[in-house]
Amino acid sequence: MTIRKAISYSFLSAIIILSSCIGNSTPKPKGFLRIEPPEVQYVLFNENELPYTFSVSQYATIELPPADSATYWINIDYPEFDAKIYCSYINITAGTLDEHVEECFKLAERAARNVAVITKKSYENKDNNVYGTLFLLEGESPSPVQFMLTDSAMHFFRGALYYKYKTNADSIAPVTEYIKNDIVELIQTFYWKK
């Protein structure tokens, strides 16, 4: 009888254990990252070797070209957001201006392949001889904000925002808006030194 009781208890225990695992599971809601950009303050970026200056967020860091370089490109890095604005500078002539403007429009259109809307906003600061266009690419774009600035005679400055990782436009929208506002500040405070 003891073997029979042992088998009965084992069978009963197995049924209890197996039936305890069956139950209604409650799905957990998806959690999304909430990004709270910091309150922004701007500082003047004025590097002696560069032919331009502008205001930049105190939370951004500027990557300069090597000291022995003849180029005037910079990168504006946002390490907290894994984002970077890649900026290039080109000396132009009145004859090459159209070529560079056309290239900027093509680059914006190429980045906007899967984008529903490209919003273009023109900027003009006659006092500082700065004219430009801001491109806002709404939707899934590798570069949601791009811009170009020129004096139409000697200087051409272009920038494009990229994230380090592939992002979902909706999830990263607060950061894109924050950096877009920094770019607008850059454009509005930009001037040529030479």
Residue positions per predicted region:
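C-terminal motif of bacterial Sec signal peptides marking the signal peptidase cleavage site
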Residues: 17-20
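Post-signal peptide N-terminal segment of mature Sec-exported envelope proteins
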Residues: 29-50
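Solvent-exposed, polar/charged alpha-helical surfaces in well-ordered, non-transmembrane soluble domains
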Residues: 54, 58, 102, 106, ...
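Bacterial N-terminal signal peptides that target proteins for export
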Residues: 1-11
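Secretory pathway targeting signatures of secreted, lumenal, and periplasmic proteins
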Residues: 50-103
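Short secondary-structure junctions
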Residues: 53-67, 110-125
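Short, well-structured beta-strand
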Residues: 120-194
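Bacterial signal peptide processing site
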Residues: 22-25
